[in-house]
Structures are given as structure tokens and as C-alpha cells.
């Protein structure tokens, strides 16, 4: 189904190690609003989506989120690849180092491991797309928080800014998907029934 291109969606060339920033950015890998959950959410929801164009959108955005996942992992790797023990000690990355050294593993900034309970595939077109819109806004908020933490390093700031912009685009696309779904339902009551389970 997929063709892998050996390049990132946005170039990442981080020159300076920063274990503290890596410990924060990793949340967009395996945190509650991260790219791993987003990709799995959309690629799971597409199967029961009754509207072909919306199922296609879920596939497209879910696939793009896999690319964002690769970007976040690359950032964490580049921020930690040449660390010394002196740079690690006393930083938020120190606890992560104990379990993973400098391997890239999905967890939130607070150390909570990724869990599939953080995303849903409800089997209801309206419910799922409403969740997707909320998920994109939560991810945008997380990127806003990360951007405030790294203004002094353009090598980190610019890729994060790109990822934040994509969250806004995805939110808009899911808004369009909601309009498509609603246009196919009873306009007097959009919530009268589940269009994925008409029984």
C-alpha cells in the first residue's frame, strides 16, 4: 500500500544536543496527543467509514502522520545522539536514559508509555471525525507549547513549526469531512442515527 521515500517531509539537521528538549519533544511521538496515536486512529477509522471520500482522507492523513512520526523520532535522535553523561545528568532526560539509553521509544514527556487507550475508532462517522478534529487541535496546542520552549534553536523550531502547521491543515480537512458526512444525512437531525450502522 505504501511507497517509502528516503527523505523526511521537512529537512531536519539539528546541530546541538539538548536532552531536556528531547525529553519534551518525545511526547509528540508517544504522548497522549502525539503522532503515533494520530496515525493509528485515522488508519483504523477508515475501515468502517461509509463515505469513500472521507475514508480516503483518513488514509491520506493517517499516512502523513506516519511521516510526522518519523520526523519527531529523527528530532529526538538528533538531539541526543552525541550526549555525554555530564549532559544527561540532572536533566529530565536522565530517567529516560535509565530505561532506553538514547534509543527512541514512544512515551509522553512525563514518562508515561504510549498506550492504545489514547485513541478511538468508534465506528460512527460523526463521532470519529469529531474526535479527529479535537485530536488535531490538541496536537496543535502541544506543538505551540514545544515552540515556546525552543525559540532559541532554529534547527528545532522550524521543523516543529512545520508540524504545527500541518495540524491546522488536518483540522480544516476534517472539518470538510464533517460537512461531507452531514450533507449525506437528514438535515433536520444530524445525530438521529449512526450512518455506519444503519440497523
Language-model segments: residues:
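Non-heme di-metal
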Residues: 1-199
